[in-house]
Amino acid sequence: MKAKRFLLAVMASSALAAQAQVNINIDAHNRGPKISPTHYGIFFEDINHAADGGLYAELIRNRSFEDGPKYGAPADMQGWTTEATEDATISTKLIEPTKKNPLLNSVQHHALELNIKASIDAPVFLINKGFWGINAVQGRTYRLSFWAKGKYNGTVKATLRDNEGENIYAETEVSGFPADKSWRKYTATLQSDSNDPKAQFALVFDGVGTLDIDMVSLFPPTFKNRENGMRPDLANMLYQMHPKFMRFPGGCFVEGQESPDNAFRWERTIGPVEEREGHWNVNWGYRTTDGIGFHEYLQLAEDLGAKPLYVVNVGLWHGGKTEVEDLQPWIDECLAALEYANGDVTTKYGAMRAKNGHPAPFNIEYLEIGNENNQPDPRQQSDRYYERYDKFREAIRAHYPNIKLIGNVVAWGDDNPKWESTIDVDLLDEHYYRNPAWFADAFHKYDSYPRTNPETGLPAPKIYVGEYAVTSGFGDLGNMNAALGEAVYMMGMENNSDIVPLNSYAPIFVNENDAKWRPDMIRFNSSRVMGTPSYYVQMLMPQNVGTQVLKVTQHNPYADQMLTASVTPAMSHTGFATWQTKASFEMPDHELKPEHLETISGNWKRNGDGSVSQTSMRQQCVAVLPNIVMDGKHYTLRYRARKDSGDEGFMIVFNYVDRDNYCWVNFGGWGNTQHGIEQIVGGNKMQTVTKRGKIESGRWYDVKIEVTGDNVKAWLDDDLVFDTQLKHDTTKGIFSSATLDERTGEMIVKVVNTSDEATTAAINVQNFKVRQAHVIRLAANRGTDENTLQQPTNISPVEQVLSPENDSKVLVEIPAYSLNIVRVKN
């Protein structure tokens, strides 16, 4: 044993890894839990124009003339323009319903009135540029529809054209004119003869009169040829992931903001599209048509081969709530949605589903009650969550006892959230947005999760990791370091599929023209789409999941001593910071002269008593003291700090090198609910450790920070709050796992190398005869490498046939920065 330890130490402390061999030993009879049939899924939310202008195939922007520049502003002609040739005129006006001039139906609040004076030789044009361009594809057929009424004599043509209107790619005359006083639907098809990702759509008029127009729609072919369906290239990206379930409609999209009218209300999203009112997606800054409605979500899940997982609103939205005592309408809305999805055609809503083209039930088996609504701070849309959950639970259990119910736990600022209630729940939804090192370090996170409730002896709630992604240290769009950290975490969940039966990365989509969140798994524009390295990890893992875990013994030369470099810099500075809070600071051991204070951001001033105050309510207000220089080996600093007003507490900055590299102890962060240590590395922030806690206003606190190498201790009024180690932004090493696919008789071995050194893995198997093997590999030259729309497959999977050494051993090269999936046939 001593010899083995000595050998590992020597190997780990050398530059070593390039030639070191990792031994991965697997006994096919030494089995772990069964893999859950729902283990890998997807999470869809309309963020970054993921729906309108994205997965939803509609090409016309502002098709019903209801959009405006922002929430609360009047509707305008967003997306639409007009042109007139010489000797012709066209004027437009958004009209509202009147008794004499009703609109198409009660949910339409505006239509477009056109006053036209044109001729065959001098036409006028109503133009829509779509969502940052309409993708005209040679040979592709497009379906046009719109509603119109009025007094107009002349013809109407529909065209696809270039931006200047000089080149016409498709043209057809719309039959049925002249129009009359009644609303009529007009349809036509166009076929493009050219390619142009920035094409425009135009209606061309050559007559005289007045027309009211509404609900102008243009559809390309859709995924599985569904009417009102999905953009095929984006939907196919999802299909390739083999999702076992699809969570919808969010995310914050579930709750909405400012008003309950901005929440997802399922019943207004079904039926003919002209009868859907749409609503403001205030959280993400644009209006949604609800073209992807409740029915389309269910249909998409079915088309992907995924079980639907519906998230229901519990009477909370960003900025408001329905009191617990008044929840019944929300509960009724939930039950009606379940009847629509699961009910027989003899039921009210089951019959409605059949009318909409799907007589067979969709069968929702999983329902989440609320979205991130169990935070410790009630201001974070988290009012009396357990009472809300229980009211929904009772009603749902009474009507649908077999549906699995998912509860919310603390969604941010807590690495180990708990269900703090005795109310029964089937699964708990954990959310983690962290850095690559956190995910790699969480490889064994679920090994120790209890499988039974120690007090009752009953099975413990299972875990649904509903949202997770590397959001710090991911680069620009999402790099290989991020993907590999996530891959290691996924392997850990796979090993514990008995307690973590569901998981889903978030978010999926981003239109490059409106990125509200980074990173995202799939990036697109009007004509192109690419997957980040994280997408390929999310695709490869469920494609190669197996049916039962096999226990792995790994002899790893990369082990503990691989990370010998210190995180703490050799020389650094200290300072202060606030986040949406005004605060004051003192340093008893140092005089804070005005010239000693360097403002990075915020409004900082020196007071007459020698203290320093920050008076802005902005986020991330930072000041440093360049005259105080610390030795990275060991230092101790003392402070006094006071919260003066605002949302949070105060922060002590340490290990400050520059604006993009420093640490802080955050007392009273996350809405004054948590203390934490955070590291800012290369401009990206990552959590090191968190703990429940809050800061009182108007009270001076004594703070002490002691740094010894990478160890940090922090005291608040003589109470030791933290004693922890700073972390690298990536964890270097080799990680492995294995499963058996009882359907094919294959052994599937996953090996991740997060380091910059290549190695070789020897896969040694027992009770399993090796006959053939091949490896599916995702690799990059550097951990910071990414894909782009211009180079979408810079990092993408490749396959290689392997030659087994014998019937019990396979050697496989493990490149630096790689995920390797070895499929071994018996």
Model-predicted segments: where are they?
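Catalytic cores of secreted or luminal carbohydrate-active enzymes
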Residues: 490, 496, 504, 519-592, ...
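Aromatic- and acidic-residue-enriched carbohydrate-binding clefts of CAZyme catalytic domains
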Residues: 42, 73, 88-113, 254-294, ...
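Short tryptophan-centered beta-strand motifs in secreted/extracellular beta-sheet-rich domains
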Residues: 186-188, 637-639, 700-707, 712-716
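C-terminal beta-sandwich/jelly-roll accessory domains of carbohydrate-active enzymes
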Residues: 570, 578-591, 598-599, 619-621, ...
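Secretory/extracellular carbohydrate-interaction modules
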Residues: 616-680
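Short carbohydrate-recognition loop motifs
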Residues: 98-122, 571, 602-622, 673-678
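Catalytic-core region of carbohydrate-active enzymes that cleave or remodel glycosidic bonds
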Residues: 300, 391-404, 419-420, 426-427, ...
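Extended acidic/polar, glycine-enriched regions
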Residues: 121-240, 327
